[in-house]
Amino acid sequence: MADKNNKEKQFSRRDFLKTTGVATGGIIGGSMLGGLVGFNLDSPTEEAGTSGESADQGSEGAGSGDYNPGRIFFHNDATFDTISQAMERIYPEDDMGPGAIALGAPFFLDMQLAGEYGNNTREYMQGPFYEGEPTQGYQSRLIRSELFRLGIERLDTEANEMFDDNFRNLDGEQMDEILTRFQEGEADMGVPADTAKPQDFFRLLRSATIEGVYADPLYRGNLNMEGWKMKNFPGHQHAYIQEIDTDSFTEINPQPLFGGDH
């Protein structure tokens, strides 16, 4: 009887440590460990587990497809669908392979904006602010998450002014026309130029899209490593000893940082 009670206590303690370890790791590790937990756990509460998520979090937006690990930064479907459609226009699906949405790039961006990338307050973000050179990179006084929120809002503003509808409801050519206006600096950001420029938003959007397509699946993009497969990129191989010793061409299946296929 005593042995049984001891076993129950041991199991309870182990379960407690597992639970608190995951929770504490999510807090200490920030968005990285939060992403790991959200990516690997397949529980019913996965999508509702982030603070502040609204009831529409679990619904299927146009940008989610069948892949939905849960969102951290984007709290409603409309905003997420808008940025998803913009990313799809930058990296569209074609006969060569899937596009940004199917590859999970919008979820990659969601995770990045919820972490230090989006909250880049330590990157010399205090004034005075001067006009930067093109070679100096990102110069806005807004942190990246703020610039993305503003940019998404202005996508809809431009869409309604030009086509009397929200951006996510437009056809591909209309979306391209609006994105081109941002790329060329013609769109109105609704704020002074020294606060944010449309081309700044477009550059970040384009970079985030490409990164989401080709990043390690650990970061929620490059779903099933399809981005790597299109490039025949081997990913993170432990060694190439066997391949070095052979005279024939060897096809190597890509490997992620952790585990097998994601």
Briefly describe each language-model feature range.
Residues M1-F11, D15:
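N-terminal secretory signal peptides
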Residues R13-R14, K18, R206:
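Basic side chains
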Residues S54-P69:
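N-terminal low-complexity, Pro/Thr/Ser-rich intrinsically disordered segments
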Residues F16-G38, D171:
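N-terminal export signals
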Residues N40-A55:
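Ser/Thr/Pro/Gly-rich low-complexity linker/stalk segments immediately outside membranes or between
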Residues A2-K4, D66-R71, A78-Q85, R89, ...:
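Mature-region segments of soluble proteins
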